[in-house]
Amino acid sequence: MRVLITGGSGFVGAALARHLSARGDEVVVFDLAMSPSIAALTARHRNASFLAGEITEWPHVAAVVQKHKPDAIIHCAAVVGVTASLAGPMATFRVNIGGAHNVLESMRLFGVKRMVHLSTEETYGPFDADVIDETHPNRPLKPYGISKYAVERLACDYVAAYGLVCLHARLCWVYGPGLPRPRVPKTLVDAAVAGKRLHLDGGGDFRVDHTYIDDCVDGIIRILDKKDHRFDVYHVASGEAASLAEIVAMIREMVPGADLKAGPGPYRFVDGTAAVRKGALDISRARRELGYAPQYPIRKGLAAYIAATRAGIA
């Protein structure tokens, strides 16, 4: 299979590129710049290549799709996260919505029928329950979630009008080696391994579904590989939601002497924005339809992440 990965130098995109290349697929990575991991990948695998381009520039997107005519596109390119989207709302809409429109239009023009779009639990806004499935109402509040839900709806229009197959993986707080964003559990693991003190004033009661990168990649590729779908949206997550206080306790247990603490109350991002109510994502649909079976519950994922950080590869 020939797969074009937009935003393929990013955290999830690069992990997908490594996995697909290793199993023998032809992988084309499209991004602003080649990351060290993608440079190493293209040097190691003849079936992996890189093209520089801007997702918001129609000529760039059209050129790569027309040249390579992929069997499928995994659309990762985006401004990711609540904090980044609040820092640049218009850039977020331009990249996330405008970029996705460029991808969809190039698919229409050049005969590419299949796309897997990396979406997010932020499309839901505040959760109505501790565990939610894909039928939960979409009421996004921040530019990130708003833009990603807009992409899902835009894709539905292209599906109806042009017969494309557009599938959406709603991810949730993906973590593991390579995570670039200063967010838990990265900040906690980094501090623990470095022997630094990190006391958070609040957030101890906050629960969210943390998904280890290997499980995330497995779920996305299962969506990619399945020929016929009854649904266009899947949760790719762990299906559980430990509290931040519980995560702190696990890390302290795994790294003796770690000086970590999370006080009670809401979780705040690095810019001070309070996170809305979260919880776990019900992954029954992905289990049933895709055979998805995450291998990294939070304790195992944290242990793997700590080991990678100690080895200097995180």
Enumerate the predicted regions with their spans.
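Conserved internal alpha-helix within the Rossmann fold of NAD(P)-dependent oxidoreductases
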Residues: W58, G99-A100, I220
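Conserved Rossmann-fold NAD(P)-dependent oxidoreductase catalytic core, especially the SDR/UDP-sugar
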Residues: H75, H101-P143
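SDR active-site strand-loop-helix element
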Residues: T6, F30, I73-A77, M115-E121, ...
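N-terminal Rossmann/SDR dinucleotide-binding element
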Residues: M1-A72
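Short alpha-helical oligomerization interface
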Residues: V82-G99, D133-P140
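C-terminal substrate-binding subdomain of Rossmann-fold SDR/epimerase-dehydratase oxidoreductases
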Residues: A192, K196, L200-A314
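Active-site helix of classical SDR
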Residues: S147-A150
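NAD(P)-dependent short-chain dehydrogenase/reductase
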Residues: S9, A129-D130, R153-V208, I213-R222, ...
